[in-house]
């Protein structure tokens, strides 16, 4: 054990009225909450809020694109709506929307060219 761990345990035990600290894990290590002060948690939460505030514009835009794509696919046909969904969300749309559609179209062309229907 390092001296720092011993000092942390000693500080935690000194704060506890019974001598057993509620901030220790079962094996005697300091718990996650005891490692960080409340001021550092507050700073991290402020930074997270600032990050989310900047990201919320993107999130709102993504939701609008998703809703428009779903309405378009339900109203004007699945193929064009799913393509617009794929354009709005490329990583998800390419794997789960465009590839199956292209695969189905290619299979249809192969069947038609071979004379089978």
Curated annotation (Swiss-Prot):
Q: Which stretches does the entry tag as region Disordered?
A: 1-31
Q: What is the protein's species of origin? A: Schizosaccharomyces pombe (strain 972 / ATCC 24843)
Basic and acidic residues composition bias: which ranges?
1-16
Protein name per its UniProtKB record:
Uncharacterized membrane protein C338.18
Residue ranges of the TM segments: 63-83, 85-105
Q: What is its main location?
A: endoplasmic reticulum
What's in the GO CC field? Answer: cytoplasm; endoplasmic reticulum; endoplasmic reticulum membrane; Golgi apparatus; Golgi membrane
The protein's topology relative to the membrane is: Multi-pass membrane protein
């Amino acid at each position: 054990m390092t001296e720092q761990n011993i000092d942390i345990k000693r500080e935690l035990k000194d704060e506890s009225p019974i001598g057993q600290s509620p901030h220790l894990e079962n094996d005697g290590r300091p718990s996650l909450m005891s490692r960080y002060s409340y001021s550092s948690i507050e700073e991290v939460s402020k930074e997270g809020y600032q990050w989310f505030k900047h990201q919320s514009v993107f999130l709102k835009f993504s939701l609008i694109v998703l809703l428009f794509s779903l309405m378009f696919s339900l109203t004007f046909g699945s193929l064009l709506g799913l393509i617009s969904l794929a354009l709005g969300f490329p990583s998800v749309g390419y794997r789960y929307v465009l590839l199956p559609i292209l695969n189905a179209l290619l299979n249809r062309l192969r069947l038609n060219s071979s004379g089978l229907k």
